[in-house]
Amino acid sequence: MLGDKQKAFRQSYRSRIAGWYNGMLHVAVIYIIGITALWIYIQHIDNVLWWEWLTLPIVGIACNLFEWYLHRQVMHRPLKWKGFRAIYDRHTLNHHQFFTDQEMRFRDQADWRVTFFPPYALVIFILISLPGVAVLNFLITSNVAWLFICTTTSTYLIYEFMHFCCHVDENWFVRYFPF
């Protein structure tokens, strides 16, 4: 059951969503950017050696640790730097007031606005990965570098999907999906 504070916040938040906002388009843009980026990366991978494949689990674990750290140290703490403060505001002051333990579900696709990151966040995440790509390309191999950015980008897309699943009604897929 929704409390009065959460009802009021949801009503206020929803009233500020632009009339042209389309949740399906929002998600489509994110995944078009991500899948296009992955397609470009994969075009550069050639004759991967067995040990280069180790990049995937190593970077996958590192990405999850990074997400945990970011969530704990930035998304739940009002830091002074403007960029971090914006992340905190969006996550803690919007997302965690919109959704609570009592009500985690979307009403409709307009509610996706408070759940999915803006599409430019994926672009920023890709840009943050580029120095790692350059270093790995220089120090190890180009395959390791491309597998690195494939993993960071894929982790972002998987995170968005899994987070979405946290806010939909319980169903067979959500219950049995192996993540």
PLM region spans:
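Cytosol-/stroma-facing membrane-proximal "stalk/adaptor" domains immediately downstream
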Residues: T152-F179
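Non-catalytic, topology-defining segments of multipass membrane proteins
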Residues: M1-Y156, F161
